[in-house]
Amino acid sequence: VFSADSGQSNGLMINKKGKMLAACGANNGKQCLAQITKNGKVKPIVETFEGKKFNAPNDLVIHPRGWVYFTDPRYVGHEPLELDHMSVFRYDPITKTVHRATSDITKPNGVVVSPDGKTLYVAETDNGASGLEKEPLKEPKLRMTLNAFPIKKDGSLGKKKILADFGDKETGIDGMTVDQKGNIYAAFRAESRFGIVVFSPEGKELAYIPTPSLPTNCTFGIGDDASTLYITAGSGLYRIPCKIPGFHPALPVDK
């Protein structure tokens, strides 16, 4: 699929029906959860919450039950902010409804679900800015954490658990993915140590994969490529073989 105008698509994922879903941001983007059709057109699925435009949908994950969780921060964009919060939302494709899933994450970024479908991992990457500033903040307040939320039977989230706190000095996590054992692969953007950091489901650091430039996202291939980790960093796309195959929530697991 090629799109000359992707509507500022960021996070992408293909559902069980083979449709590509996208989180479309601001800065002349669509500001919505959308489907990218086979001819590259952006087809909005949901554009508002309680009648107000989303800030700038950033990343998404499809739960095995079909729910779409997507993050809605604002890093760039000249459009006025209509919502007074930056949250994780859950879209239900059966009822065609959208629900606010979090109220205790100040600026959510990457999002991924555990292989058993019981936990939602959310990267909190708060640079203290709204995206409307004309000049960079001199002393931004940063909140950089990796969080785990239990997923209830109705798709709502339970109490947040902070798995890792990266302090308030450098940038934290962007996109994430998981392997079939539930380990989390996070695109870590700290200037002093950027690359892919692998965490256990409990938040223990297991491995570090340096990248040539600041990474933005990562995902595993499928089929024969299931153990290959693909990484976007700077203007490049990189790959590295891994010992454990990746997990895709919307696809069946190869056994």
Map each language-model feature to its residues:
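Short loop/turn segments immediately following beta-strands, especially the blade-tip
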Residues: 139, 148-156, 241-248
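Hydrophobic alpha-helical segments and helix pairs
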Residues: 35-98
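A short loop-to-beta-strand structural motif that recurs across blades of beta-propeller domains
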Residues: 31-34, 86-89, 145-147, 195-197, ...
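Short consensus segments that form the blades of beta-propeller domains
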Residues: 24, 77-82, 132-140
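Beta-rich, blade/repeat-based domains predominating
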Residues: 5-24, 30, 50-68, 85-87, ...
